[in-house]
Amino acid sequence: LTPPVDMWRQRWARIGLIDGDGRAVAGKEADLLIRAGRAARLTRRAGAVDFAAGPTAGQIAEYLRRAGIDYALTGDAGANRYRSSAGEAWPVLYVEDVDRAAEAAGLARKEPGSFGMRVTLIPFDGVSEVGRVDIAGVTVVARDQVVIDAYGGIDRMVEQADILMGRRVA
């Protein structure tokens, strides 16, 4: 384990969220995923690049599939693939290569410091791509990764994560 990962494991073990093996304590899974999401906000992910709003996550996924670029939906679009509960406010995708993916999808970078709607591409990091699933022909990150990302997201994403965790009714 890297020192930062070990630090988080120690913190979460001290407050009773994980056991000595690093596994979530029964009944504490949602609490652990909430804390992980809040500690790793989507807006601050390493290598994340924002692009001008335009295509939906599903459209971008199709462009990437046609170009042979590895990807996985997350955030509200990913949560909706597991259980539809809200409109898509912010397309966020993990990709194997941000520049190639942006080119294939015809995305234009947002100006630094600009606000408003956006599309965000985040490079795979060795963890986010583990457990991906195909849902109706679209690749989506593992359910727990969607939940972490939704808890680390904006607006209705937190509610979507709660719905996926059974903490709220759609």
Language-model regions, residue ranges each:
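Glycine-centered loop/turn motif at secondary-structure junctions
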Residues: 1-2, 15-17
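Helix N-cap and loop-to-helix transition residues
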Residues: 4-5, 75, 142
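C-terminal regulatory/effector modules of DNA-binding transcriptional regulators
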Residues: 98-170
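Short gly/ser-rich loop at a beta-strand->alpha-helix junction or flexible surface loop bordering the NTP-binding
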Residues: 16-20, 24-125
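Short amphipathic alpha-helical interaction segments
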Residues: 2-11
